[in-house]
Curated annotation (Swiss-Prot):
Single GO MF descriptor: DNA binding
PTM summary: Rapidly degraded via the ubiquitin-26S proteasome system through two ubiquitin-conjugating enzymes UBC2/RAD6 and UBC3/CDC34.
Location, primary (coarse class): nucleus
Gene Ontology CC terms, in alphabetical order: nucleus
Source organism per UniProt: Saccharomyces cerevisiae (strain ATCC 204508 / S288c)
Occurrences of domain DOD-type homing endonuclease (ranges): 215-370
Phylogenetic placement of the source organism: Eukaryota, Fungi, Dikarya, Ascomycota, Saccharomycotina
Function: Initiation of mating type interconversion. This protein is a site-specific endonuclease that cleaves a site in the mat locus on chromosome III. The double-strand break is followed by a unidirectional gene conversion event that replaces the information at the mat locus by information copied from either of the two homologous loci (HMR and HML) that reside at the extremity of the chromosome III. Endonuclease expression takes place in late G1 just before cells enter S phase.
Pfam families from the UniProt entry: Hom_end (PF05204), Hom_end_hint (PF05203)
Localisation: Nucleus
GO biological process assignments: gene conversion at mating-type locus; intein-mediated protein splicing; mating type switching
InterPro entries: Hint_dom_N, Hint_dom_sf, Hom_end_hint, Homing_endonuc_PI-Sce, Homing_endonucl, INTEIN, Intein_endonuc_central
Keywords attached to this entry: DNA-binding, Endonuclease, Hydrolase, Metal-binding, Nuclease, Nucleus, Zinc, Zinc-finger
SUPFAM superfamilies, per the entry: Hedgehog/intein (Hint) domain, Homing endonucleases
Protein name: Homothallic switching endonuclease
Amino acid sequence: MLSENTTILMANGEIKDIANVTANSYVMCADGSAARVINVTQGYQKIYNIQQKTKHRAFEGEPGRLDPRRRTVYQRLALQCTAGHKLSVRVPTKPLLEKSGRNATKYKVRWRNLQQCQTLDGRIIIIPKNHHKTFPMTVEGEFAAKRFIEEMERSKGEYFNFDIEVRDLDYLDAQLRISSCIRFGPVLAGNGVLSKFLTGRSDLVTPAVKSMAWMLGLWLGDSTTKEPEISVDSLDPKLMESLRENAKIWGLYLTVCDDHVPLRAKHVRLHYGDGPDENRKTRNLRKNNPFWKAVTILKFKRDLDGEKQIPEFMYGEHIEVREAFLAGLIDSDGYVVKKGEGPESYKIAIQTVYSSIMDGIVHISRSLGMSATVTTRSAREEIIEGRKVQCQFTYDCNVAGGTTSQNVLSYCRSGHKTREVPPIIKREPVYFSFTDDFQGESTVYGLTIEGHKNFLLGNKIEVKSCRGCCVGEQLKISQKKNLKHCVACPRKGIKYFYKDWSGKNRVCARCYGRYKFSGHHCINCKYVPEAREVKKAKDKGEKLGITPEGLPVKGPECIKCGGILQFDAVRGPHKSCGNNAGARIC
């Protein structure tokens, strides 16, 4: 069962709160079909937060302390469900060859297999388990080990896909738990709202409809909200010509305006009707303009304050319309970087100052089967073309998705952003690793779907239909939590730990790198500061504090807890644990 804060993607593309979903309504399934809701149940149970693991760290360090808005990880995938709710989990099956023994005297092959396991309350569940097999360290032994690996790869496949209840996740060992992933899926069907508005038919996706979607994306990226005016890079003639051609389809012609001081960005107005034969003062700019009607009537411009936004119906539009719309945003405000070879190497970044546009970019990207993350930058002063510019708080939307991203770029018209259409488009679910944490008690709802199909949440996460295991409170009984924690930061679930100041493997890779570079750590909260944070603490001067043993100590102040930073002049295997250089015992 799912928390009352959960949103559901309905069959018509609408995103609805689960509390408002009724029996006999239709939801969007993972395979693109619509399925009827047979029954809706309600209860009050303990819930767990299933949350995407990310590399966002701004909320942990100095950026989050200086700017409260950067403490939020925007558009992080998550769902709240009960302990008895089943998750569709995937783990890799790739066997590994490594050396074993005190002096590496044997070859060891580590592999995984699905097998039965009995829980502490007597249930039988099927989960993957780690196994290993040893071979002598000889030429024959190495050959036999490689043959065994090939046999395992043929018989096991690339991944194990299995269903597991949330309360049983602790029965996976640490390595399996870290590599476990759930998925979100693309939206394969379209609601056709834009097509219906432009052509009168929701199933009609013509080149004219796609050209309008592209112009709407271009307008949302860089334009004024007062009139149909778009800023275009004057050094990109292909973009200007493409805008002229797409506008002509809708009976629009362009006029280029310039500032008092000529700039690289030119203001292009979209007038309706034939171009004037002579210079006249009155032109159809907003009156009868089909582009401006789409902007205002379909709510791309908010009514109350006139701010730009991406309306929710665009999240579930036809795939071609979504791709053309996103391409317009990329042409206007996006960057395309190619790293390595192959279609998977394209990385797309779109910057915006509007939170509603950021939400729309992420939703549309995920609905096309692409991964999307958001980083932030605080308000700042920058110098652009020799001028000081006050930049607002910015959202950086980063998108990647293999052939799906390349197909989006094929709709772009900017000369250096457009790419060829890929020969094959693989629109598949995207997997992500996750953590699970207890949240408390809440009102929960369970949806029973016809055919027990998997359906999509509002954030595109694929979930299973509720069955008998969801009814009633399910006890979570397990021996221990297998995920490890870094002692210096909140990070958990990481594979490898490194030696800290005590000589034990207790810190993650980032904190280990900081400690190795700066040599400082807090004696109270064990936080490892960055070099710039150490410099600021030293500039403030030393302060008097108390060690955990109750002794007075003097040193730089920890900016996180107000404790004392200790400096270890010698780090590594030759460090003496009793060395307190930099934090003087008084």
